[in-house]
C-alpha cells in the first residue's frame, strides 16, 4: 500500500468458516486492510480478532460501508472469486485492470481468506464493521445505503459468472457419505462462511445477523485478562496501528452468521480448496492409485474426495471404508477385466507389443538405413573384427543390431575362455598369432550359421559414432533392449555369485539348515516355510506343487510335515513356484471354488472348454469367449442352429453318425465314475475300490455311492476272489471289469435292437466295437520233469523218396601225355536237402539207414582253380 494513501477500509470478518488446521488457526484472525484509493493495487485485508474488541465501541446491527461519493474512484471489494479468478466482473463502463499485490504483514492471510466463487450471499454478523482508518466511526453511517447497493450488484454478477465453474466440483457432495459429514456439529468462531447457493433469481441478496436464528452450537466464552480461548487464538502478527480502535464482542457467546439446519456443502468445498494446497499431492496420487488397483470399479474422483473430506490418509482405512460401504459410486463407462486375463488383452499391449529381439523367428528384415546404422554401431563395438565379417553376420541375422551383437559377444567370450591366460604385451601378441580367429556360431531352432572370423592386426581407429537422438527409432529401440538385457544378465550373474558365496560362508560356519523333506542342508535364503514355520528347500516345494497340481489336482498345498495341518501361504508360493505351476494352481483353485459355489450353474463350452454360469432353466449356451462365440445346446452339446425345434433325441436320430456317436459315448461313460460332489470323471487303473477325488470326496468304485473311510467294504476274512459268506458288502479288492463289460453289452444290445426295429434287419449296422469275449483262464501247469534217456527200440523210418533224376557224374579230365588242359573250374555236385528227420533229442546214438547214393561231402569250392 502506498504511503500517501489514507482512504483505507477495514472489514471485521467475525465469523469466517475455515479449516481447523494448525496453520489456519494462527492466520484466520489476522488483520485484513482494504484500500479503495487506487485501482492498481490489490486490496490487503485486516481481520480484527473478536476478543480484542472494546465493549465501549459496540455498534448497532447495521453493516456500514464507507466510501467516496465519486464512482470513478470506486475501490475493489474483497477477492471473493475462485482461486483461478483474480477479480470480479466490473459493471459496464468500468475499465478492467489487473490488480497488483500490495504490502501486507502476512501474505498467507491474503491467500487463505478467499471464499469460493459459487457464493451468492455474504453474511456479515452484527459488530462486523467496514470503516476507514483516518475517518471517525460516526461518519460511517452516512454512506451505508449506497455502499450496500453497489456491494450487492458486484457480488451478484461475480457469483453468476462463477456458478458454472463450481458445478463440477460439487459432483459428490450430494452423496450420503458426505451428508453425514456435513451434519456433524462443529465449533465455529470468528468465521464468515458462504451460505448455500440460492436460485439465480436471488443472486446478490445480502442477509444480516438479525434475520437468522440463534446458533445451534455456541462458541465457548473467552477467558478473562485478554487471553483468547482455544476457539479464538491470537493472530500471528499483532495489530500495531489499530490497537486503539479494536472492537469488543457484543456478546460473550455470539452465534454463527448462518443457520445450521441446512447442508454446509459450500463450507466443505472451501475447506477442501484450502487443504488441497497443503496436502502432499504425491501421497494422494499414490493412495488413489493403490486403492483403484484394489477396487477397479470405483468412480473417478471419488477416492480423492474421500481422502480430503474425511482425512483418510491411510490405505487400510480407505479400503475398510469401501468394504463397509459397498454401494459407493461405481464406473459405468467400461467393464472391469482382470489384466492377466488370457481372453482379452489391454490396449497398451495391443498398441506397443513387447518384441524379443533375441528371438530370430519373430524378426523381420530391416531397411537399408537401419542396416547401415547398425553396422556402424557394431564396428565401433568390435574394433578387432573386420567390417566384412560384421556386415556378413548382420546380413545373415536380418539386419538387427541386438541379436547380432549378442552373437558376436558370445563368440568372443567363448574365445576368451578357451585361450590360455597371458600377461604382458609380448605374450599377448604371440598368443594372438596363435589364436587369431573366432568361430562365429548361431544356432536357434532350425537356423544354424557358422563362420570363422579372423582378427585384424591392429584395432580399427576410425569408426562412425552416432548420438542417441540421431539413431533411427528401430535401431534405438534395439540398442535400449540390448542394454537392458545385458544389465539383467549381469544382475543375475551377480545374484548367483552372491548365493554361492553365501552358501560357502554358511558351510564354513556350520550354520546350514536341514530340509524337513529331503534332509539336505541349505542356507536359509534357499528355504521356504509353511504357516507353522516348518522349513523346506525350494526344490522340494516345486516338485510337490507340480505333482499336486498336475497330478492329483489338489486344491490346497498342505505342509509336508506329517504332523502339521497348516498349508503354505500364498506369498511363499509366489516367491518359489514357477509361473506355469503357479498359474495352474490358481486356475485349479478358482475352478474348484466356482464349482463348489455354483455346481449346477457352471457350464463349459464343448468347443473351447470356456466356463460360464448359466441358469438351470436355460437350454441354450452362448460361449462368452470372444474367440469362440458358439451357441450350443446345454443338454446334448450340439449346435443350436441345427435343432430347429427338434429335441435332443430327435436331433441325434436325424443324423446316423451322431446317433451312433451318442451311443458310443454312453458305452464309454459306463466305464467312468463321476464324483458326486464336483462331477469329475474317475477311472481306476489299479488299487483298491475306495476312490478319492481331487476335491476330497470318496466313493465306492463298485456301487458308485459316497462313502467315508473303509467301513463300507467287507471286513470278514476270506479267500481272494471268493464272495463273502457272512455279508453282502462290496469287496475292497476286486476287478470291476466284468461288471463294466456287462453294462456296456446291455447298452449296445438295446441300441442295436432299436435300430433294427426302425430301419429293418437289412440296414442293420453294428454300433460300437465288437464285444471281446474274455480270455478263458488256463490253469497253471507245473513244470514237467526232464526225461531220462533210455535204450529203447526206435521205430524204423521209411526211406526218403527222391523225385529228381540221378545226379550227373563229374567230368573226367582226359590225360594226354600228361599235359594239363585249361577246362575251367569243375562244378560241385548237387546236394539235395536232408530228410526231415528228428535228430535233436537226448537219446543215445541211433544208427539209421540213410540213402546210400547221397555224397558225403560238398565238393570243391565253386571258384576254385587249379
UniProtKB/Swiss-Prot annotation:
Compositional bias of kind Polar residues: 137-156
Designated name of the protein: E3 ubiquitin-protein ligase RNF216
Region Disordered: start-end pairs: 46-117, 131-161, 211-240
Residues holding Zn(2+) 4: 675, 678, 693, 695
Annotated keywords: Apoptosis, Coiled coil, Cytoplasm, Cytoplasmic vesicle, Disease variant, Host-virus interaction, Hypogonadotropic hypogonadism, Isopeptide bond, Metal-binding, Phosphoprotein, Repeat, Transferase, Ubl conjugation, Ubl conjugation pathway, Zinc, Zinc-finger
Active-site positions on this chain: 688
PTM-bearing positions, type Phosphoserine: 419, 719
Swiss-Prot/TrEMBL domain comment: The RING-type zinc finger domain mediates binding to an E2 ubiquitin-conjugating enzyme.
Record region (TRIAD supradomain): 511-728
Molecular-function GO terms, alphabetical: ubiquitin protein ligase activity; zinc ion binding
PROSITE patterns the record matches: TRIAD (PS51873)
Consequence of substituting residue 719 to A: Mild reduced activity
Self-association state and partner proteins as the record states: Interacts with UBE2L3 and to some extent with UBE2L6. Interacts with TRAF3, TLR3, TLR4, TLR5 and TLR9. Isoform 3/ZIN binds RIPK1. (Microbial infection) Isoform 3/ZIN binds RIPK1 and HIV Vif.
Species of provenance: Homo sapiens
Amino acid at each position: 500500500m502506498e504511503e500517501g494513501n489514507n482512504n483505507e477500509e477495514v472489514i471485521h470478518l467475525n465469523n469466517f468458516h475455515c479449516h481447523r488446521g494448525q496453520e489456519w488457526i494462527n492466520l484466520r484472525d489476522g488483520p485484513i486492510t482494504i484500500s479503495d484509493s487506487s485501482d492498481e493495487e490489490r486490496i490487503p485485508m485486516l481481520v480484527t480478532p473478536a476478543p480484542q474488541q472494546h465493549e465501549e465501541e459496540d455498534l448497532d446491527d447495521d453493516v456500514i460501508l464507507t466510501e467516496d461519493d465519486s464512482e470513478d474512484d470506486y475501490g475493489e471489494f474483497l477477492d471473493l472469486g475462485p482461486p483461478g479468478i483474480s477479480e470480479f466482473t466490473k459493471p459496464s463502463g468500468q475499465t478492467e485492470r489487473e490488480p497488483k499485490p500490495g504490502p501486507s504483514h502476512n501474505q498467507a492471510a491474503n491467500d487463505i481468506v478467499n471464499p469460493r466463487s459459487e457464493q451468492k450471499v455474504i453474511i456479515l454478523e452484527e459488530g462486523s464493521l467496514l470503516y476507514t482508518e483516518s475517518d471517525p466511526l460516526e461518519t460511517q453511517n452516512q454512506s451505508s445505503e449506497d455502499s450496500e447497493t453497489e456491494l450487492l450488484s458486484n457480488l451478484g454478477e461475480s457469483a453468476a459468472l462463477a456458478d458454472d465453474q463450481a458445478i463440477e466440483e460439487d459432483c459428490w457432495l450430494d452423496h450420503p457419505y458426505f451428508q453425514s459429514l456435513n451434519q456433524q456439529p462443529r465449533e465455529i468462531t470468528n468465521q464468515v462462511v458462504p451460505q448455500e447457493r440460492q436460485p439465480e433469481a436471488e443472486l446478490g441478496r445480502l442477509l444480516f445477523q438479525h434475520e437468522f436464528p440463534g446458533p445451534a452450537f455456541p462458541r465457548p466464552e473467552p477467558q478473562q485478562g485478554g487471553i483468547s480461548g482455544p476457539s479464538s487464538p491470537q493472530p500471528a502478527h499483532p495489530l500495531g496501528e489499530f490497537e486503539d480502535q479494536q472492537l469488543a464482542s457484543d456478546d460473550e457467546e455470539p452465534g454463527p452468521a448462518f443457520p445450521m439446519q441446512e447442508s454446509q456443502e459450500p463450507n466443505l468445498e472451501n475447506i477442501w480448496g484450502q487443504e488441497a494446497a497443503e496436502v502432499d499431492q504425491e501421497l494422494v496420487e499414490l493412495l488413489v492409485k493403490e486403492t483403484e488397483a484394489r477396487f477397479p470399479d470405483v468412480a473417478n474422483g471419488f477416492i480423492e474426495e474421500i481422502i480430503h473430506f474425511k482425512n483418510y490418509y491411510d490405505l487400510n482405512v480407505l479400503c475398510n471404508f469401501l468394504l463397509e460401504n459397498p454401494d459407493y459410486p461405481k464406473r459405468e463407462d467400461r467393464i472391469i477385466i482382470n489384466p492377466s486375463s488370457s481372453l482379452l488383452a489391454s490396449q497398451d499391449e495391443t498398441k506397443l507389443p513387447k518384441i524379443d529381439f533375441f528371438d530370430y523367428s519373430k524378426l523381420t528384415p530391416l531397411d537399408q538405413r537401419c542396416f547401415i546404422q547398425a553396422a556402424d554401431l557394431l564396428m565401433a563395438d568390435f574394433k578387432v573384427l573386420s567390417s566384412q565379417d560384421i556386415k556378413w553376420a548382420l546380413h545373415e541375422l536380418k539386419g538387427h543390431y541386438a541379436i547380432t551383437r549378442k552373437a558376436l559377444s558370445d563368440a568372443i567370450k567363448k574365445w576368451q575362455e578357451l585361450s590360455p591366460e597371458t600377461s604382458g604385451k609380448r605374450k599377448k601378441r604371440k598368443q594372438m598369432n596363435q589364436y587369431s580367429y573366432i568361430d562365429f556360431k548361431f544356432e536357434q531352432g532350425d537356423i544354424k550359421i557358422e563362420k570363422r572370423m579372423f582378427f585384424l592386426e591392429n584395432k580399427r581407429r576410425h569408426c562412425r559414432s552416432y548420438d542417441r537422438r540421431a539413431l533411427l527409432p528401430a535401431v534405438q529401440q534395439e540398442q535400449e533392449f540390448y542394454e537392458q538385457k545385458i544389465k539383467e544378465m549381469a544382475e543375475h550373474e551377480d545374484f548367483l555369485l552372491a548365493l554361492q558365496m553365501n552358501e560357502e560362508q554358511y558351510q564354513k560356519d556350520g550354520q546350514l539348515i536341514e530340509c524337513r523333506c529331503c534332509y539336505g542342508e541349505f542356507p536359509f535364503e534357499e528355504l521356504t516355510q509353511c504357516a507353522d514355520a516348518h522349513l523346506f528347500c525350494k526344490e522340494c516345494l516345486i516338485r510337490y506343487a507340480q505333482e499336486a497340481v498336475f497330478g492329483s489336482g489338489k486344491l490346497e498345498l498342505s505342509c509336508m510335515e506329517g504332523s502339521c495341518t497348516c498349508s503354505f501361504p500364498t506369498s511363499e508360493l509366489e516367491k518359489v513356484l514357477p509361473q506355469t505351476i503357479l498359474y495352474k494352481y490358481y486356475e485349479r483353485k478358482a475352478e474348484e471354488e466356482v464349482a463348489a459355489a455354483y455346481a449346477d450353474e457352471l457350464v463349459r463350452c464343448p468347443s473351447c472348454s470356456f466356463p460360464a454360469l448359466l441358469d438351470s432353466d436355460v437350454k441354450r449356451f452362448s460361449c462368452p469367449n470372444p474367440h469362440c462365440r458358439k451357441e450350443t445346446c446345454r443338454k446334448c452339446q450340439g449346435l443350436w442352429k441345427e435343432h430347429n425345434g427338434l429335441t435332443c433325441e430327435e436331433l441325434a436320430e436325424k443324423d446316423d453318425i451322431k446317433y451312433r456317436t451318442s451311443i458310443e459315448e454312453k458305452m464309454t461313460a459306463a466305464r467312468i465314475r463321476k464324483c458326486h460332489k464336483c462331477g469329475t470323471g474317475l477311472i481306476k487303473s489299479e488299487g483298491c475300490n475306495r476312490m478319492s477325488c481331487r476335491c476330497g470326496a470318496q466313493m465306492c468304485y463298485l456301487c458308485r455311492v459316497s462313502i467315508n473311510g473303509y467301513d463300507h467294504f467287507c471286513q470278514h476274512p476270506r479267500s481272494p476272489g471268493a464272495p463273502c459268506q457272512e455279508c453282502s458288502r462290496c469287496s475292497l479288492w476286486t476287478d470291476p471289469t466284468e461288471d463294466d463289460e456287462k453294462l456296456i453289452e446291455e447298452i449296445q444290445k438295446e441300441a442295436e435292437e432299436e435300430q433294427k426295429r426302425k430301419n429293418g434287419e437289412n440296414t442293420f449296422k453294428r454300433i460300437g466295437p465288437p464285444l471281446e469275449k474274455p480270455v478263458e483262464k488256463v490253469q497253471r501247469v507245473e513244470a514237467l520233469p526232464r526225461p531220462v534217456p533210455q535204450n529203447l527200440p526206435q521205430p524204423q523210418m521209411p526211406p526218403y523218396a527222391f523225385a529228381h533224376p540221378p545226379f550227373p557224374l563229374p567230368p573226367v579230365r582226359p590225360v594226354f601225355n600228361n599235359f594239363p588242359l585249361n577246362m575251367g573250374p569243375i562244378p560241385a555236385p548237387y546236394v539235395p536237402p536232408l530228410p526231415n528227420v528228428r535228430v535233436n533229442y537226448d537219446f543215445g546214438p541211433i544208427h539209421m539207414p540213410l540213402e546210400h547214393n547221397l555224397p558225403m561231402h560238398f565238393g570243391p569250392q565253386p571258384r576254385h582253380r587249379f
